[in-house]
Amino acid sequence: MSGHKCYSWELQDRFAQDKSVVNKMQQKYWETKQAFIKATGKKEDEHVVASDADLDAKLELFHSIQRTCLDLSKAIVLYQKRICFLSQEENELGKFLRSQGFQDKTRAGKMMQATGKALCFSSQQRLALRNPLCRFHQEVETFRHRAISDTWLTVNRMEQCRTEYRGALLWMKDVSQELDPDLYKQMEKFRKVQTQVRLAKKNFDKLKMDVCQKVDLLGASRCNLLSHMLATYQTTLLHFWEKTSHTMAAIHESFKGYQPYEFTTLKSLQDPMKKLVEKEKKKSSRRENREAVAQEPRQLISLEEENQHKESSTCQKEEGKSVPSSVDKSSADDACSGPIDELLDVKPEEACLGPMAGTPEPESGDKDDLLLLNEIFSTSSLDEGEFSREWAAVFGDDRLKEPAPMGAQGEPDPKPQIGSAFLPSQLLDQNMKDLQASLQEPAKAASDLTAWFSLFADLDPLSNPDAIGKTDKEHELLNA
């Protein structure tokens, strides 16, 4: 047996059983069951999960590094595009200002030329930022494709070993439920599963250590990469700001004493004719405003004159209204006096005195007074009844029997028949009549006060205290 290792038949049988197809199938079954539990998120053993807490923290850090590096690479690419676009636009603006400055020979042209040169210089200096950014992007991509990818492979192998280890633990848990140490039942099977668990744990611990070390190294290398590349970018950016600010400050100092210009941007293009029309409209509106401001005191004066004119016109209207009303009243009194004279047996000549007296047209201020006097004198015709009866007894009642000429509306003709009043006897009788009337008028006027009460009859018909209690026809007619 020298030179040869001797193994017992029991160890050879056990090794053969471990390599059997049945053992491999059982091992794959419990690994698949563990993967299913992890995928579905079912609750696992608390102690097993707690033993892997530090590993889970390292895995979370690794996934964060992987995600942030991908976002950083995308941001760098987008930032480079924006810088190129901004530099191009700034260069175009500088060229435009320079071209316009060459055409303008004033101070504004010089300022535009200097500003255009400064903008072109700034655009060129801004393009210098692309060099550290391109280097930064290359370093990040290298870090992603090498360091992170290598760590990711190690993490995948570690996860596979952890699944095998936890599956072996589930298998051992299931076998231990059927184990009976007193009867040595299932003892060989338990030992076989226990050996599988130890082997899986050994591989898992080794890969676990590798993953933790690689994640720590990955974090440190990422910090080193960012600090180095960002320092280069920061230096380039500071140089760019320094050169640009120095150039802009020099231009500002050189044109410090120049008068500033007010520039307006066009929101829409307009034709020259439209501009002229708008200018004319603005000028006309300004003129109208000035004229309105100048006419304000004149309008105030004219308002006072208009007020005075309105007051005078209203007074004239009121006077005009009062005159027709008085005329209407006089015509109504004349219309009423006609039937009253007929009832009182008054002569037509005396009844016609009232209308004849009112024929001349006096002034508007004296019309009311004349109408009142006519009303007063018309009542005196009631006292001349005795003289008319005596005249009728001596000379007859021929004149009374003659019908009085009627007008168009049944009223007596206001013109008296004076065709035969030129005989000597009639003239003598007329003189006698005037003398008797002049002697009787003062006495009758003092005794009879009905004329004065009839003056106020329009205001208060019941103002005659002498007529209260009297029922003769004369007072009834007066009250009516």
Swiss-Prot record:
Compositional bias (Basic and acidic residues) spans?
A: 276-293, 306-321
- Matches recorded under SUPFAM superfamilies: BAR/IMD domain-like
Q: One Pfam family from the UniProt entry? A: ICA69
Keyword annotations of the record: Cytoplasm, Cytoplasmic vesicle, Golgi apparatus, Membrane, Neurotransmitter transport, Synapse, Transport
* Localization of this protein: Cytoplasm, Cytosol; Golgi apparatus membrane; Cytoplasmic vesicle, Secretory vesicle membrane; Cytoplasmic vesicle, Secretory vesicle, Synaptic vesicle membrane
PROSITE patterns named among the record's database cross-references:
AH
- Does the keyword section mention Cytoplasm? yes
Q: Where is this region: Disordered?
A: 276-338, 400-421
Name a single GO biological process.
neurotransmitter transport
Topology relative to the membrane? Peripheral membrane protein
Residue ranges constituting the AH domain according to the UniProt record: 50-253
Single GO molecular function: protein domain specific binding
Instruction: Enumerate the InterPro entries for this protein.
Output: AH/BAR_dom_sf, AH_dom, Islet_autoAg_Ica1/Ica1-like, Islet_autoAg_Ica1_C
Q: What are its GO cellular component terms?
A: cytosol; dendrite; Golgi apparatus; Golgi membrane; Golgi stack; perinuclear region of cytoplasm; secretory granule membrane; synaptic vesicle membrane
Chief location category: cytoplasm
Q: What does this protein do?
A: May play a role in neurotransmitter secretion.
Give the protein name, as stated in the record.
Answer: Islet cell autoantigen 1
Q: Tell me which species this is from.
A: Rattus norvegicus (Rat)
High-level lineage: Eukaryota, Metazoa, Chordata, Craniata, Vertebrata
In the UniProt record, what gene is named as encoding this protein?
A: Ica1
